[in-house]
Amino acid sequence: MSSEARSRSSVARSAHSLRLRPWHVRVLAVSVAVLLCTTGLPAYSVLTHEEIVDLVWTDQIGPLLLKRFPTLTEDQLKEAHAYAYGGAVIQDLGYYPFGSVEFSNLVHYVRSGDFVRELLAQSQDADEYAFALGALAHYASDISGHPAVNTAVALQYPKLRARYGNSVKYAEDHTAHLKTEFGFDMVQVAKNRYASQQYHDFIGFQVSKTLLERTFPIVYGIELKEILTHEDLAIGSYRFAVSRTIPEMTRVALRTHQKDMMKETPDFAKEKFLYRLKRSDYEKEWGKDYKKDGFKTRVFSILLRYMPKIGPFKALAFNNPTAQTEDLYFKSINTTVDQYRIYLKQVSASSLELVNTDFDTGKPAKAAEYSLADNTYAKLLSQLADHKFSLTSPKLRDNILGFYSDLSLPLQTKKDSAQWQSVLASLDQLKSTTPNASVEPAPSQPTPN
């Protein structure tokens, strides 16, 4: 009997022992379908983004909400917490089923700070405000998280380090990034360092569609529906993936890898993180264990033992972090929380300033420094030209012209001569076009509760 036949036989016996029924197969099929359509999750994974919100919820985010909306009830605060979770990973919406990678590329590489500031300015109620504050958490997370992951990938993969140096960016090896990020999540779950899945289920996960629709054309000069052509389906599948499929796959991976998880080692950065975690009071009420294995988890873990780690399953073949890379992770989390607290204080004082950062490098977005940024600017410019720059605001015009201020730079776009000629023609059109000042309205006023 071949090894492939033996694998199929083992899976069949294991599934039979668990009495796999038709409805179980359907549930598993839906989960696998979502996973198959997920194209990538750069920077911190979902659980880490949500944890950043949890670490500052009680002493900063909650009070900020009450400062602006003083009559909020406990139930309304809980609902706002769900929207903060949604905002904390909204920049990654395009990487989920039925989403648009173009959406995530724009908010990662083009006017990333302006996008978050405009979400805050346009928010009208507590849910929208919480959603915007969550998006600010993502901004803080990515500008410190990406450089840390870039370094960790280089440490975990010597061949990549030899090729790219001590920092391996997402565009240079997607798979290594996914494995590294997922490995960080697995270790934290294994050691009970995240708010429990029971707590996440209680809070929920929400997306402020109307706020996104108002904000996106102001920042990028095109309507959201042009980028997310199946907007409702994209948001719905995104919520399902974050609240159901990803936690399920986390439990599956944990079940299959837990014996190999690294042992604890003394470390100052880790202790600082754990101290902050203990100050959160979620553990008292909800327990610290990630949700226990259920039927689906047991079946999935059996199937995945024999499934080749290719395509969307590559991340499940992650390497456990080393003591050195886990230290990088903790330091980046601590830096993120410290910086996020500063941003929240600036929000409270109406003095928030955010640099338009390239999330993958953690540096200000500039031409010829990152291939994905170059390509994203070129595509946006082409789309704006197709619309005769009708929704192009003065700030957007200045941002694009600033990006292309030195045409002698070795931009990635120049590798395609036709695309580069299109960029040059569109730039000439933009320079001769009067921007639409009405696109940038005065910030919306809070809606009283």
Segments and roles (model prediction):
Residues 137, 250, 265-266:
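Mature extracellular/secreted ectodomains of secretory-pathway proteins
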Residues 225-233:
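Ordered core of a single globular domain
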Residues 26-38:
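Bacterial N-terminal signal peptides
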Residues 135, 139-143:
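Catalytic glutamate of the conserved HExxH
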Residues 27, 247-255:
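Short, low-complexity Pro/Thr/Gly
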Residues 1-22:
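N-terminal secretory signal peptides that target proteins for export/translocation
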Residues 41-130, 143-225, 255-260, 271-449:
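N-terminal, motif-rich segments that launch catalysis or mediate targeting to/interaction with membranes
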Residues 235-245:
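Eukaryote-specific, cytoplasm-facing alpha-helical/coiled-coil scaffolding segments in long proteins
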